[in-house]
Swiss-Prot record:
GO terms for biological process: spermidine biosynthetic process. The active site is at 200 (proton acceptor). This is Spermidine synthase 1. Pfam families: Spermine_synt_N (PF17284), Spermine_synth (PF01564). The gene is SPDSYN1. One of its GO terms (molecular function) is spermidine synthase activity.
């Protein structure tokens, strides 16, 4: 049996913060009255994700049953059973994951960076309180230490209760869970500590904007060893090309190794896709497009939990961009 994770606590400010300018909720033919916790009635009905970050559109899921509703110190948390995507985790009215398609995001944000460098040993996860990224990092037998910093303990607890196949990563003995502000944790990390940093962040609006700006990336670069890598979620080419361009500019100013944009499909995310920014620090060269560190086929997790989405071919294909996105990103190279 795996040992329970080590847990440290902090009272610092949040990493995943409430989106003050969002309007999210549920459409229902029976009731649209807001409930005391700020969530609309969804029994029975449809959950709809609406935001000024994707104006003029919404994505809806048929709700079979609400399993959990709560309010943490930082955000509203809800879990419901959907008709077509299994259980769904919602934070502040925004879909974080579903049982059906979480594999695409979790596997790609993890294995794109970790399969691009030989023998990663120390990995930091910022955010990721559902445990899915931890589950995927644990597939790499070379990894000796996995630190995770998540602001909201309720997300961790709810994920363990309602998404055990995702939160299984917390049980790995290599994991140390830190409850606190990921930005502050990263600033306090000794220089050159990590081989890889994975930033599972919220969207860049409001206070979370700092997670996509130059000072944050400078903290990431400082915490990485020479030739170390970072992977952060980087929005949708269909909705946020202007944001992606700004991220590219900031990353090229900070990271003197490789800087690449990749993407994958996630049906329940806005526009049905999500992007990743992958960067490396100066040092041993990193070619993100051609993986050098395949996941061990004989790893114990492969037998019990085979990969559902990631493979070597889709790794390389993730860096193939449509012409409009390729031109926009190339225009920011100088």
């Amino acid at each position: 049996m795996a040992a329970p994770e080590n847990t440290l606590h902090s009272t610092d400010s949040p990493l995943k913060r409430q989106r003050e300018d969002e309007v999210n909720g549920v459409s229902d033919t029976l009731s649209k009255e807001p409930q005391p916790n700020g969530l609309s009635s969804v029994i029975p009905g449809w959950f709809s994700e609406i935001s000024p970050m994707w104006p003029g559109e919404a994505h809806s899921l048929k709700v079979e049953k609400i399993l959990f509703q709560g309010k943490s110190d930082y955000q509203d948390v809800m879990v419901f059973q959907s008709a077509t995507y299994g259980k769904v985790l919602i934070l502040d009215g925004v879909i974080q994951l579903t049982e059906r398609d979480e594999c695409a995001y979790q596997e790609m944000i993890t294995h794109l960076p970790l399969c691009s460098i030989p023998n990663p040993k120390k990995v930091l996860v910022i955010g990721g309180g559902d445990g899915g990224v931890l589950r995927e990092v644990a597939r790499h037998s070379s990894v000796e230490k996995i630190d995770i910093c998540e602001i909201d303990k309720m997300v961790v607890d709810v994920s363990k209760e309602y998404f055990p196949d995702i939160a299984v990563g917390f049980a790995d003995p290599r994991v140390t869970l830190n409850i606190g502000d990921g930005v502050a944790f990263l600033k306090a990390a000794p220089e050159g500590t990590y081989d890889a940093v994975i930033v599972d962040s919220s969207d860049p609006i409001g206070p979370a904007q700092e997670l996509f700006e130059k000072p944050f990336f400078e903290s990431v670069a400082r915490a990485l060893r020479p030739g170390g890598v970072v992977c952060t979620q980087a929005e949708s080419i269909w909705l946020h090309m202007h944001i992606i361009e700004d991220i590219v500019v900031n990353c090229r100013q900070v990271f003197k190794g490789s800087v690449n944009y990749a993407w994958t499909t996630v049906p329940t995310y806005p526009s049905g896709m999500i992007g990743f920014m992958l960067c490396s620090t100066e040092g041993p060269s990193v070619d993100f497009k051609h993986p050098v560190n395949p996941i061990d086929e004989n790893d114990s997790q492969q037998a019990a939990r085979p990969l559902k989405f990631y493979n070597r071919e889709i790794h390389s294909a993730a860096f193939c961009l449509p012409s409009f996105a390729k031109r926009a990103i190339a225009s920011k190279e100088n």
